[in-house]
Protein backbone atom coordinates (compact mmCIF):
# COMPACT_ATOMS: atom_id res chain seq x y z
CA UNK A 1 0.00 0.00 0.00
CA UNK A 2 2.22 2.77 1.29
CA UNK A 3 5.68 1.39 1.91
CA UNK A 4 8.64 0.63 -0.32
CA UNK A 5 10.00 4.20 -0.34
CA UNK A 6 13.15 3.41 1.61
CA UNK A 7 15.55 5.39 -0.54
CA UNK A 8 13.64 8.66 -0.46
CA UNK A 9 12.86 8.24 3.24
CA UNK A 10 16.52 7.57 4.09
CA UNK A 11 17.52 10.80 2.36
CA UNK A 12 14.83 12.72 4.27
CA UNK A 13 15.88 11.08 7.54
CA UNK A 14 19.49 12.07 6.90
CA UNK A 15 18.45 15.71 6.48
CA UNK A 16 16.66 15.53 9.84
CA UNK A 17 19.65 13.78 11.37
CA UNK A 18 22.08 16.46 10.16
CA UNK A 19 19.83 19.21 11.50
CA UNK A 20 19.68 17.60 14.92
CA UNK A 21 23.38 16.83 15.12
CA UNK A 22 24.85 20.04 13.75
CA UNK A 23 26.63 20.65 17.05
CA UNK A 24 27.81 17.05 17.36
CA UNK A 25 29.29 16.34 13.94
CA UNK A 26 32.32 17.71 12.13
CA UNK A 27 31.92 19.08 8.63
CA UNK A 28 33.59 15.93 7.30
CA UNK A 29 31.10 13.73 9.15
CA UNK A 30 28.17 15.75 7.83
CA UNK A 31 29.50 15.44 4.31
CA UNK A 32 29.93 11.69 4.69
CA UNK A 33 26.35 11.34 5.97
CA UNK A 34 25.01 13.26 2.98
CA UNK A 35 27.11 11.20 0.58
CA UNK A 36 25.88 8.01 2.25
CA UNK A 37 22.26 9.02 1.69
CA UNK A 38 22.99 9.91 -1.94
CA UNK A 39 24.73 6.57 -2.49
CA UNK A 40 21.72 4.71 -1.09
CA UNK A 41 19.27 6.66 -3.24
CA UNK A 42 21.27 5.79 -6.35
CA UNK A 43 21.91 2.13 -5.47
CA UNK A 44 20.40 -0.42 -7.86
CA UNK A 45 20.96 -3.42 -5.56
CA UNK A 46 18.21 -3.38 -2.89
CA UNK A 47 19.71 -6.43 -1.20
CA UNK A 48 22.92 -4.51 -0.51
CA UNK A 49 20.92 -1.73 1.14
CA UNK A 50 18.89 -4.28 3.09
CA UNK A 51 22.09 -5.72 4.56
CA UNK A 52 23.75 -2.36 5.25
CA UNK A 53 20.84 -0.42 6.75
CA UNK A 54 20.73 -2.10 10.21
CA UNK A 55 24.04 -0.46 11.16
CA UNK A 56 22.50 2.93 10.44
CA UNK A 57 19.45 2.01 12.53
CA UNK A 58 21.66 1.03 15.47
CA UNK A 59 23.59 4.29 15.18
CA UNK A 60 20.36 6.27 15.41
CA UNK A 61 19.26 4.31 18.50
CA UNK A 62 22.64 4.97 20.10
CA UNK A 63 22.35 8.72 19.53
CA UNK A 64 18.91 8.76 21.16
CA UNK A 65 20.25 7.32 24.41
CA UNK A 66 21.54 10.76 25.44
CA UNK A 67 19.56 12.97 23.03
CA UNK A 68 15.96 11.74 23.29
CA UNK A 69 14.78 15.34 23.63
CA UNK A 70 15.74 16.22 20.04
CA UNK A 71 12.70 15.98 17.76
CA UNK A 72 14.81 15.74 14.59
CA UNK A 73 16.63 12.67 15.88
CA UNK A 74 13.36 11.06 16.92
CA UNK A 75 11.91 11.75 13.49
CA UNK A 76 14.96 10.39 11.66
CA UNK A 77 14.92 7.19 13.72
CA UNK A 78 11.16 6.86 13.20
CA UNK A 79 11.51 7.24 9.43
CA UNK A 80 14.27 4.66 9.17
CA UNK A 81 12.54 2.04 11.31
CA UNK A 82 9.28 2.47 9.43
CA UNK A 83 10.84 2.36 5.97
CA UNK A 84 12.99 -0.66 6.80
CA UNK A 85 10.02 -2.55 8.25
CA UNK A 86 7.88 -1.85 5.18
CA UNK A 87 10.56 -2.50 2.57
CA UNK A 88 12.83 -5.20 3.91
CA UNK A 89 11.35 -7.16 6.84
CA UNK A 90 9.57 -10.34 5.78
CA UNK A 91 8.57 -11.55 9.26
CA UNK A 92 5.18 -9.88 9.96
CA UNK A 93 5.63 -9.99 13.74
CA UNK A 94 9.01 -8.28 13.55
CA UNK A 95 7.75 -5.77 10.99
CA UNK A 96 4.82 -4.83 13.22
CA UNK A 97 7.15 -4.40 16.20
CA UNK A 98 9.45 -2.09 14.21
CA UNK A 99 6.50 -0.07 12.93
CA UNK A 100 5.13 0.29 16.47
CA UNK A 101 8.52 1.55 17.63
CA UNK A 102 8.61 3.98 14.71
CA UNK A 103 5.15 5.32 15.49
CA UNK A 104 6.07 5.84 19.15
CA UNK A 105 9.18 7.79 18.10
CA UNK A 106 7.20 9.92 15.63
CA UNK A 107 4.46 10.72 18.14
CA UNK A 108 7.13 11.58 20.75
CA UNK A 109 8.63 14.13 18.36
CA UNK A 110 5.17 15.54 17.61
CA UNK A 111 4.49 15.87 21.34
CA UNK A 112 7.78 17.71 21.93
CA UNK A 113 7.05 20.20 19.15
CA UNK A 114 3.32 20.59 19.75
CA UNK A 115 2.16 19.46 23.22
CA UNK A 116 -1.49 19.82 22.20
CA UNK A 117 -0.93 16.95 19.73
CA UNK A 118 0.57 14.40 22.12
CA UNK A 119 -2.22 11.88 21.53
CA UNK A 120 -3.22 12.27 17.86
CA UNK A 121 -4.88 8.84 17.69
CA UNK A 122 -7.34 9.93 20.37
CA UNK A 123 -8.36 13.12 18.59
CA UNK A 124 -11.26 13.35 16.18
CA UNK A 125 -10.51 14.41 12.63
CA UNK A 126 -12.01 17.84 13.35
CA UNK A 127 -9.90 18.27 16.50
CA UNK A 128 -6.77 17.23 14.65
CA UNK A 129 -7.52 19.60 11.79
CA UNK A 130 -8.04 22.50 14.18
CA UNK A 131 -4.77 21.74 15.99
CA UNK A 132 -2.81 21.84 12.72
CA UNK A 133 -4.05 25.16 11.39
CA UNK A 134 -1.19 27.11 12.97
CA UNK A 135 1.46 24.88 11.39
CA UNK A 136 3.65 26.37 8.66
CA UNK A 137 6.50 25.41 6.32
CA UNK A 138 8.79 24.71 9.25
CA UNK A 139 6.45 21.90 10.30
CA UNK A 140 6.46 20.10 6.95
CA UNK A 141 9.23 17.61 7.90
CA UNK A 142 7.32 16.82 11.09
CA UNK A 143 4.00 16.36 9.28
CA UNK A 144 5.57 14.25 6.53
CA UNK A 145 7.35 12.00 8.99
CA UNK A 146 4.38 11.44 11.28
CA UNK A 147 2.16 10.86 8.25
CA UNK A 148 4.44 8.37 6.48
CA UNK A 149 5.26 6.46 9.67
CA UNK A 150 1.61 6.32 10.69
CA UNK A 151 0.69 5.10 7.20
CA UNK A 152 3.36 2.40 7.42
CA UNK A 153 2.00 1.30 10.80
CA UNK A 154 -1.49 0.99 9.29
CA UNK A 155 -0.15 -0.85 6.23
CA UNK A 156 1.20 -3.65 8.41
CA UNK A 157 -2.19 -3.94 10.15
CA UNK A 158 -4.41 -3.77 7.09
CA UNK A 159 -6.66 -6.54 8.42
CA UNK A 160 -7.33 -4.60 11.63
CA UNK A 161 -10.20 -2.19 11.07
CA UNK A 162 -9.29 -0.30 14.24
CA UNK A 163 -5.94 0.53 12.61
CA UNK A 164 -7.49 1.28 9.21
CA UNK A 165 -9.84 3.71 10.96
CA UNK A 166 -6.80 5.98 11.47
CA UNK A 167 -6.44 6.57 7.71
CA UNK A 168 -8.53 9.80 7.70
CA UNK A 169 -6.11 11.26 10.26
CA UNK A 170 -3.11 10.33 8.12
CA UNK A 171 -4.83 11.81 5.09
CA UNK A 172 -5.37 15.02 7.03
CA UNK A 173 -1.64 15.31 7.76
CA UNK A 174 -0.73 14.79 4.10
CA UNK A 175 -3.40 17.23 2.95
CA UNK A 176 -1.94 19.84 5.29
CA UNK A 177 1.50 19.27 3.73
CA UNK A 178 0.00 19.80 0.27
CA UNK A 179 -1.59 23.05 1.47
CA UNK A 180 1.72 24.31 2.87
CA UNK A 181 4.31 22.90 0.43
CA UNK A 182 2.88 20.77 -2.41
CA UNK A 183 6.33 20.05 -3.89
CA UNK A 184 7.67 18.51 -0.67
CA UNK A 185 9.87 15.51 -1.47
CA UNK A 186 9.12 15.79 -5.20
CA UNK A 187 5.43 15.05 -4.86
CA UNK A 188 5.54 12.47 -2.06
CA UNK A 189 2.42 13.86 -0.31
CA UNK A 190 0.40 13.13 -3.46
CA UNK A 191 1.73 9.57 -3.55
CA UNK A 192 0.47 8.97 -0.03
CA UNK A 193 -2.85 10.72 -0.64
CA UNK A 194 -3.36 8.62 -3.76
CA UNK A 195 -2.49 5.43 -1.91
CA UNK A 196 -4.94 6.28 0.87
CA UNK A 197 -7.77 7.31 -1.45
CA UNK A 198 -7.48 4.17 -3.62
CA UNK A 199 -7.05 1.71 -0.76
CA UNK A 200 -10.77 1.02 -0.40
CA UNK A 201 -13.33 0.49 -3.18
CA UNK A 202 -15.92 3.26 -3.63
CA UNK A 203 -18.59 1.13 -1.96
CA UNK A 204 -16.54 1.19 1.25
CA UNK A 205 -15.70 4.90 1.13
CA UNK A 206 -12.73 4.91 -1.23
CA UNK A 207 -12.11 7.89 -3.50
CA UNK A 208 -10.85 6.07 -6.60
CA UNK A 209 -11.12 8.96 -9.09
CA UNK A 210 -9.51 11.41 -6.70
CA UNK A 211 -6.81 8.89 -5.83
CA UNK A 212 -5.95 8.28 -9.48
CA UNK A 213 -5.59 12.04 -10.00
CA UNK A 214 -3.30 12.26 -6.95
CA UNK A 215 -1.11 9.39 -8.14
CA UNK A 216 -0.87 11.01 -11.57
CA UNK A 217 0.14 14.25 -9.84
CA UNK A 218 2.85 12.39 -7.90
CA UNK A 219 4.28 11.13 -11.20
CA UNK A 220 4.10 14.61 -12.72
CA UNK A 221 5.84 16.29 -9.80
CA UNK A 222 8.58 13.66 -9.92
CA UNK A 223 9.19 14.46 -13.60
CA UNK A 224 8.01 10.97 -14.45
CA UNK A 225 10.53 9.19 -12.23
CA UNK A 226 8.14 7.86 -9.57
CA UNK A 227 7.44 4.26 -10.66
CA UNK A 228 5.91 3.34 -7.30
CA UNK A 229 2.85 5.48 -8.06
CA UNK A 230 2.08 3.25 -11.06
CA UNK A 231 2.52 0.11 -8.97
CA UNK A 232 0.04 1.44 -6.40
CA UNK A 233 -2.40 2.28 -9.17
CA UNK A 234 -2.15 -1.25 -10.57
CA UNK A 235 -2.51 -2.91 -7.18
CA UNK A 236 -5.24 -0.73 -5.69
CA UNK A 237 -7.19 0.48 -8.71
CA UNK A 238 -6.78 -2.08 -11.49
CA UNK A 239 -7.06 -5.07 -9.18
CA UNK A 240 -9.98 -3.62 -7.24
CA UNK A 241 -11.86 -3.06 -10.50
CA UNK A 242 -10.67 -6.37 -12.02
CA UNK A 243 -9.21 -4.43 -14.94
CA UNK A 244 -6.55 -6.82 -16.25
CA UNK A 245 -5.54 -4.69 -19.29
CA UNK A 246 -4.92 -1.64 -17.08
CA UNK A 247 -3.11 -3.79 -14.51
CA UNK A 248 -0.72 -5.35 -17.02
CA UNK A 249 -0.17 -2.13 -18.97
CA UNK A 250 0.92 -0.21 -15.87
CA UNK A 251 3.13 -2.97 -14.48
CA UNK A 252 4.77 -3.83 -17.80
CA UNK A 253 5.60 -0.14 -18.21
CA UNK A 254 7.22 -0.14 -14.76
CA UNK A 255 9.26 -3.27 -15.51
CA UNK A 256 10.37 -1.91 -18.90
CA UNK A 257 11.40 1.50 -17.53
CA UNK A 258 15.01 2.41 -16.85
CA UNK A 259 15.12 2.59 -13.04
CA UNK A 260 18.27 4.70 -13.00
CA UNK A 261 17.53 8.33 -12.19
CA UNK A 262 19.33 10.52 -9.71
CA UNK A 263 17.61 10.20 -6.35
CA UNK A 264 15.15 7.56 -7.56
CA UNK A 265 17.14 4.43 -8.46
CA UNK A 266 16.65 2.40 -5.27
CA UNK A 267 12.96 3.21 -4.98
CA UNK A 268 12.41 2.38 -8.64
CA UNK A 269 14.22 -0.96 -8.28
CA UNK A 270 11.93 -1.79 -5.36
CA UNK A 271 8.94 -0.74 -7.48
CA UNK A 272 10.08 -3.03 -10.29
CA UNK A 273 10.45 -5.95 -7.86
CA UNK A 274 6.89 -5.37 -6.66
CA UNK A 275 5.63 -5.05 -10.25
CA UNK A 276 7.14 -8.41 -11.20
CA UNK A 277 5.49 -10.08 -8.20
CA UNK A 278 2.10 -8.62 -9.12
CA UNK A 279 2.46 -9.73 -12.74
CA UNK A 280 3.45 -13.23 -11.64
CA UNK A 281 0.33 -13.54 -9.48
CA UNK A 282 -2.02 -11.92 -12.01
CA UNK A 283 -3.38 -15.15 -13.52
CA UNK A 284 -4.43 -16.41 -10.10
CA UNK A 285 -5.92 -13.04 -9.11
CA UNK A 286 -7.90 -12.38 -12.27
Which residues make up each language-model segment?
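N-terminal alpha-helical interaction modules that lie
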Residues: 22-187, 200, 221-224, 239-286
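Alpha-helical adaptor scaffolds
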Residues: 182-223
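C-terminal motif of bacterial Sec signal peptides marking the signal peptidase cleavage site
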Residues: 17-20
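Bacterial N-terminal signal peptides that target proteins for export
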Residues: 1-10
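Alpha-helical protein-protein interaction modules
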Residues: 212, 231, 235-240, 244
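Short conserved catalytic/interaction loops centered on acidic-Pro-aromatic/His motifs
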Residues: 206-207, 225-231, 244
Amino acid sequence: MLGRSFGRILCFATVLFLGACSSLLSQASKGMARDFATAVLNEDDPQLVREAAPSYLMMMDALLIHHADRPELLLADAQLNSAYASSFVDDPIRAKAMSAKALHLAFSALCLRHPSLCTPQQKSVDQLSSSMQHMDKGDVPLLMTVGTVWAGWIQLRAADWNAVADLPRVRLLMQRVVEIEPDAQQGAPFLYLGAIDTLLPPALGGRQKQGIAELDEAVRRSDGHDLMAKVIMARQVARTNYDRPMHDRLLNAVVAADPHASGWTLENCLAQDEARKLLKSADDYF
